[in-house]
Regions:
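Interfacial segments of alpha-helical transmembrane regions
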Residues: 2-13, 88-114, 191-194
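A hydrophobic membrane-anchoring alpha-helix module
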Residues: 158-185
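N-terminal signal-anchor transmembrane alpha helix
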Residues: 4-30
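Juxtamembrane membrane-water interface segments of multi-pass membrane proteins
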Residues: 22-29, 95-100, 175-194
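Long, glycine/tryptophan/cysteine-rich extracytoplasmic
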Residues: 21-73, 119-159
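Hydrophobic alpha-helical transmembrane segments
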Residues: 11-15, 72-93, 166-176
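Membrane-interfacial loop-to-transmembrane-helix junctions in polytopic alpha-helical membrane proteins
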Residues: 1-7, 66-73, 95-102, 153-163
Length: 218
């Protein structure tokens, strides 16, 4: 692999280490009665922000309360991020293209699985409502947006990556660039090697002049 690709991979791996301790995602809630806003912070290993206030509000509309211990993801996610941080660094140091390919496909697969898991949690959180809630709006669901803005009754909900999330996404984008560069470079090398093998064979098969006919042979 190119030297600058290897350096970028090592830097990405080092940048992923603080992600373990930073919030990866945030959901901001804005309403007239809360002009300063409420914020739910999602860390790799816990929930943070105004969790208690949000739980109190959600109780009235029948939503489940949020507790870190209810999510197995918070147990394994810090280790997965640590694994990818180490994988980035090792790949950059060793410099093997196949290692980078494996890293790329694992990283993309993890990202897609994480997005699906987050969407599934939001769906269950917003649709599985208690029938004994103090406030029931027929046909109303309170699923937060996966990303972007959504109006939920008198609350405006904004769902966006936080510090750790942006670092994680940036590492993925840099990995994609490195993957494309090395894939194209490997393709050019393969074509050049094929030509280097085929051209001498082709030239050797061509005669420089007419050959005499050998009686009893030709």
């Amino acid at each position: 692999m190119k030297s600058w690709v290897r350096v970028l991979l090592v830097l990405c791996g080092l940048a992923l280490v603080p992600v373990i301790f930073l919030p990866m995602w945030r959901i901001d809630l804005v309403a007239p009665q809360y002009p300063e806003g409420l914020r739910l912070l999602i860390y790799p290993g816990k929930l943070g922000g105004n969790v208690d206030i949000i739980n109190g509000l959600n109780h009235y509309i029948g939503m489940k309360t949020l507790h870190t211990e209810d999510f197995i993801e918070f147990t394994i996610l810090p280790y997965l991020i640590g694994f990818f941080a180490a994988f980035f660094v090792v790949t950059g140091i060793i410099g093997k293209r196949k290692l980078m390919y494996a890293l790329f496909f694992l990283f993309v697969s993890f990202g897609l699985l994480a997005i699906y898991d987050f969407w599934r949690w939001e769906y269950n959180y917003g649709h599985n409502l208690s029938p004994d809630a103090a406030i029931i709006v027929p046909g109303m669901a309170y699923q937060p947006p996966l990303i972007g803005f959504k109006q939920l009754l008198n609350f405006g909900a904004y769902s966006i990556p936080d510090q750790g999330g942006w670092i994680f996404v940036s590492a993925g984008a840099i990995l994609l660039v490195c993957f494309i560069v090395e894939w194209r470079r490997a393709s050019r090398i393969s074509k050049g090697l094929a030509m280097a093998i085929l051209v001498p064979v082709f030239l050797n098969s061509c005669s420089s002049g007419p050959q005499a006919i050998s009686p009893g042979v030709d």
